Every structure is written in structure tokens, then in C-alpha cells.
């Protein structure tokens, strides 16, 4: 598989970003094992209140500064609970951050981990651990609605974007009220505009508030509604022709 880094295509094993993700995946997996957590969902708030960081003999966590973390509005039903879980996951991540930096610098010849947002990357993995997501997503054919039922403490947005950390190539697009909010890929530089197939799926999901999956013109596209009375968000997972086997 190939991912894009600094504007060029590279194999996963040749990319420092891949090494970082594996390091963080392993760290979170160790944390889950020591906390005797063997299946989702992860209640980060309960872990925080239970002082779970002590299981790895880590420093007590601190509430991260706004500059150090990703602040987002999940735009979904139950947003307050999802936000609470995200903040708790970020706070837990602050206690794992030091160990992550030590491992990263050891792996890279004491090169300082400058500019890496460890807290956000770890928090995403606490709510949606890679070793679970990889097998569960494959078994569910990457169905976001079904994944949300399993990883219910994580926002749809986080679950969708975590698919980019898996081996399967795809483009994830988040559309809010008809405007592209995020469009990211693990296999290419995604076109700024939607393909005809993506646009067709988006229009159907937006108008009907129902999931849609289409294979047309070489594109494989699945779309899901995350709709509220005053806000319409759609999330697409697309596989472009050049990324298919």
C-alpha cells in the first residue's frame, strides 16, 4: 500500500509517519491490556475518574491547553456526551504523551519530536483503538453507522478519519450543509471537488437521510447521514479507481 507524504507517494514502511502510528498503536494497546479492556466501547471518562494512568505508572494527567489539542464540534445527536469523552481521552493522552515522546526519540536517534500532536493522535486511539478497528471495520465492510454502534463513545468524525490509519486506501470527506468541511486521503492527494459518483451519493444521502453505497465509473463510494434538525452533515468513504486492486 502507498500513502502520501510531503506530496510524494511512498510505501508505508518507508514513511516516518507510519512508524509513529505503529508506536502509538502499540502504546495504546499496552494501556488497554493493563486496564483489562478487551472490547469497545471505551469509556474514557470512567478511565480518567478511575485514575487508569496509574496502571502504566505514568504521571497524573493534566487538562491540555487549547493550543495543544484538537477542538471540534461533532455535529451529532448526543454531542455533549461525545465531547465529554473526547476531552477525557485528551486528558488521558496527556499522561501517555511523555512515554510516546521517549519512544519516538529512541526510535529516531534522539531526534526531538517537534511539531507532533501526540495528544490528539493518542486520544483518537484511546476511543478507537487500531487493533480493534482494523478487524471490526473489515468485518463490517467499513460501515460507519455500524462502527458507531460499536465505538459509541467516539464521534462519527473521529471514527471516519481513523479509517485513514488502516491499510485500505480511501478518501474520507465530511460535508456540512452542502459545503466540504474536510477531505483527506491515505492513498493520494484528493481532488478538491467531488467526483460524479461521490456527488451522486452525497445528494442522495443529503436528501433522503439514508446511507448509500455505489460502484460507478470506477469509483466505490459509501455515504452516511449525520443529520440533526438544524444541521446536515454527510460523511463519504471513497475508493478512487487508481487505488483499487
Regions found by a protein language model. Name each.
Residues 1-245:
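Active-site hotspot residues in diverse enzymes, especially metal/ion-binding acidic/histidine motifs
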Amino acid at each position: 500500500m502507498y500513502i502520501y507524504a510531503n506530496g510524494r507517494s511512498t510505501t508505508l514502511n518507508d514513511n516516518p509517519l507510519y512508524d509513529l502510528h505503529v508506536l502509538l498503536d502499540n502504546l495504546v494497546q499496552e494501556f488497554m491490556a493493563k486496564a483489562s479492556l478487551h472490547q469497545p466501547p471505551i469509556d474514557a471518562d470512567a478511565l480518567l475518574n478511575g485514575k487508569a494512568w496509574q496502571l502504566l505508572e505514568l504521571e497524573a494527567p493534566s487538562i491540555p491547553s487549547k493550543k495543544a489539542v484538537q477542538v471540534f464540534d461533532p455535529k451529532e445527536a448526543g454531542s455533549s456526551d461525545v465531547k465529554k469523552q473526547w476531552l477525557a481521552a485528551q486528558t488521558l493522552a496527556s499522561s501517555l504523551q511523555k512515554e510516546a515522546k521517549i519512544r519516538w526519540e529512541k526510535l529516531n536517534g534522539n531526534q526531538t519530536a517537534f511539531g507532533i500532536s501526540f495528544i490528539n493522535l493518542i486520544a483518537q486511539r484511546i476511543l478507537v483503538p487500531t487493533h480493534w478497528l482494523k478487524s471490526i471495520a473489515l468485518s463490517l465492510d467499513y460501515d460507519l453507522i455500524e462502527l458507531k454502534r460499536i465505538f459509541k463513545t467516539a464521534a462519527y468524525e473521529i471514527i471516519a478519519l481513523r479509517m485513514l490509519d488502516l491499510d485500505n486506501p480511501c478518501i474520507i470527506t465530511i460535508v456540512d450543509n452542502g459545503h466540504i468541511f474536510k477531505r483527506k486521503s491515505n492513498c493520494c492527494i484528493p481532488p478538491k471537488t467531488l467526483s460524479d459518483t461521490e456527488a451522486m451519493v452525497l445528494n442522495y444521502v443529503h436528501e433522503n437521510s439514508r446511507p448509500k453505497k455505489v460502484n460507478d465509473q470506477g469509483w466505490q463510494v459509501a455515504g452516511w447521514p449525520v443529520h440533526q434538525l438544524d444541521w446536515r452533515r454527510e460523511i463519504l468513504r471513497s475508493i478512487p479507481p487508481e487505488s483499487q486492486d
